[in-house]
């Protein structure tokens, strides 16, 4: 299962990006996709602390309280390995996104072709990581 967390403080952006993500899920019948939507970094962070992480994080950068960059850094400090995709109106923070080991940095507005391609790349990367891991059974 591919779990995707969308976090954006603007309702209109949550709605439009959320619709794109739902279209992505519908266009990928070979993948089970579960989307969770958050209006603040703190809400997402609280959910991750209580219930665990997500496969992919689609994060706005400029948000009140805790920026998307700072949220990404905190997720990494908590050892969450999900792919972080920043989606924002400003290229100003692109270099800062390296601190969170971002998978990609996209500019708003983003079209479905670009977003779907990046999501496919992230999902493929996660599949490769899972396949490369080794389980050792002990007594």
Predicted features and spans:
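Conserved SAM-binding loop
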Residues: 6, 37, 86-87
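CheY-like receiver
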Residues: 46-129
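A generic structural motif
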Residues: 25-35, 81-82
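Conserved acidic segment of CheY-like receiver
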Residues: 2-22, 57
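Short, well-ordered amphipathic alpha-helices
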Residues: 15-25, 44-45, 72, 120
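Conserved Asp/Asn-Gly motif in the active-site loop of CheY-like receiver
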Residues: 35-43
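C-terminal output/effector regions of signal-responsive regulators
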Residues: 135-139
């Amino acid at each position: 299962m591919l779990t995707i967390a969308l976090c954006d403080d603007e309702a209109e952006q949550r709605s439009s990006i959320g619709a794109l993500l739902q279209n992505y899920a519908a266009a990928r019948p070979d993948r089970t996709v579960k989307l969770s939507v958050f209006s603040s970094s703190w809400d997402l962070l609280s959910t991750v602390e209580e219930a665990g992480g997500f496969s992919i994080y689609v994060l706005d950068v400029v948000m009140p309280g805790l920026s998307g960059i700072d949220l990404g850094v905190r997720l990494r400090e908590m050892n969450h390995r999900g792919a972080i995709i920043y989606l924002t109106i400003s290229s100003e923070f692109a270099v800062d996104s390296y601190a969170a080991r971002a998978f990609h940095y996209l500019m708003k507005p983003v079209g479905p072709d670009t977003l779907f391609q990046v999501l496919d790349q992230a999902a493929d990367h996660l599949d490769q990581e899972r396949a490369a891991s080794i389980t050792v059974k002990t007594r």
